[in-house]
């Protein structure tokens, strides 16, 4: 296993860990993304468990399995997840400028999403150097 594979596994652990915790504690996911479910409607809680929980956990878990098993295409799969994280950071930068949303939290999140994207994309990037 290469250093870039271990980097991607760390990214999977972080993203998947966040997803797993969001499935267990949707209120935590709500706080992290600064969104609230509509009071009195249970579908909002289901959305946090499903999207921020299940989607994040299972996509990162499968990428981790593929990397750890050395499956063909694992680097591309992890890089696709990385592109999603990087894209979230780009969208946040756009919001910082267009919406005048410069805050310490937004700055931190841009860095976090960019680093996580780089960790996940590392095997694909290294394989093409």
Predicted regions and their residues:
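Small-residue-rich segments of transmembrane alpha-helices in multi-pass membrane proteins
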Residues: 44-47, 107-121
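Juxtamembrane boundary at the C-terminal end of a transmembrane helix
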Residues: 121-129
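N-terminal signal-anchor transmembrane alpha helix
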Residues: 5-24
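Transmembrane alpha-helical segments of integral membrane proteins
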Residues: 86-99
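Core segments of alpha-helical transmembrane spans in multipass integral membrane proteins
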Residues: 44-67, 83-87
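Structural signature of hydrophobic alpha-helical transmembrane segments
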Residues: 11-13, 75-85
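Cytosolic, membrane-interface loops and tails of multi-pass inner-membrane proteins
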Residues: 25-45
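Non-cytosolic membrane-interface motifs at loop->transmembrane helix junctions
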Residues: 5, 101-111
């Amino acid at each position: 296993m290469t250093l870039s594979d271990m980097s991607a596994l760390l990214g999977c652990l972080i993203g998947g860990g966040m997803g797993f915790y969001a499935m267990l504690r949707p209120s935590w996911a709500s706080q992290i993304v600064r969104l609230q479910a509509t009071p009195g409607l249970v579908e909002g809680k289901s959305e946090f468990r499903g999207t921020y929980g299940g989607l994040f956990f299972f996509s990162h878990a499968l990428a981790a399995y593929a990397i750890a098993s050395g499956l063909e295409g694992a680097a591309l799969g992890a890089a696709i997840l990385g592109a999603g994280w990087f894209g979230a950071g780009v969208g946040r930068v756009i919001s910082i400028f267009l919406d005048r949303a410069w805050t310490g939290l937004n700055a931190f999140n841009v860095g976090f999403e960019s680093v996580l994207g780089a960790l996940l994309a590392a095997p694909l990037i290294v394989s093409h150097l």
